[in-house]
């Protein structure tokens, strides 16, 4: 016997809302992983909690690559839909602004990761890449000390 349908409205109780968010987020991440494996699809998922905490999943090794690919695709789509040069110029500026804003957010997120913050939201592969980058950076420090 299955459960009844849940009415789609905001859950007023803060604790119940948080529990539901955590469970549904886990289910969503699991489904994203399953579809990437079963269908050999490239899947990326970005979820922000109501407090702004980032949760992400990427079937690729790096979310940045997927975001860059998405930017290129959406840019090409917008170019095809905007033949007017004035509208096109305005679109280019707004797209450039959006692209740079996304890049800044990405750099800020990476900086937080380098400082050891928000690590629970990234995958094992990304943690391994982060560890490798930090090891490489640490190996360069003695050579810089010698140069000075």
UniProtKB/Swiss-Prot annotation:
The keyword Ligase does not apply. GO terms for cellular component: nucleus. Residues 90-148 form the K-box domain. It holds the Pfam family K-box. Residues 1-61 form the MADS-box domain. SMART domains: MADS (SM00432). It comes from the Eukaryota. It is found in: Nucleus. Keywords: Activator, Coiled coil, Developmental protein, Differentiation, DNA-binding, Flowering, Nucleus, Transcription, Transcription regulation. GO terms for molecular function: DNA-binding transcription factor activity; protein dimerization activity; RNA polymerase II transcription regulatory region sequence-specific DNA binding. CDD domains: MADS_MEF2_like. GO terms for biological process: cell differentiation; flower development; positive regulation of transcription by RNA polymerase II. Homodimer capable of binding to CArG-box sequences. This is a truncated version of CAULIFLOWER that may contribute to the 'cauliflower'-shaped floral meristem (curd). This trait has likely been selected by early farmers during the domestication of modified inflorescence structures. PANTHER family: SERUM RESPONSE FACTOR HOMOLOG (PTHR48019). Probable transcription factor that promotes early floral meristem identity in synergy with APETALA1, FRUITFULL and LEAFY. Is required subsequently for the transition of an inflorescence meristem into a floral meristem. Seems to be partially redundant to the function of APETALA1. This is Truncated transcription factor CAULIFLOWER C. The lineage of its organism: Eukaryota, Viridiplantae, Streptophyta, Embryophyta, Tracheophyta.
């Amino acid at each position: 016997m299955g459960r009844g349908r849940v009415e789609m409205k905001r859950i007023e109780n803060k604790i119940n809302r948080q529990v539901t968010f955590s469970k549904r987020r886990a289910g969503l991440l699991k489904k994203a992983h399953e579809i990437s494996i079963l269908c050999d699809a490239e899947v990326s998922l970005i979820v922000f909690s109501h407090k702004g905490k980032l949760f992400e999943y990427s079937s690729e090794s790096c979310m940045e690559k997927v975001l860059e690919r998405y930017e290129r695709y959406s840019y090409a789509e917008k170019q095809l839909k905007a033949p007017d040069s004035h509208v096109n110029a305005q679109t280019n500026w707004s797209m450039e602004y959006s692209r740079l804003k996304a890049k800044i957010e990405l750099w800020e997120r990476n900086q937080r990761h380098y400082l050891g913050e928000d690590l629970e939201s990234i995958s094992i592969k990304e943690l391994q890449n982060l560890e490798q980058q930090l090891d490489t950076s640490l190996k360069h420090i003695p050579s810089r000390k010698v140069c000075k």
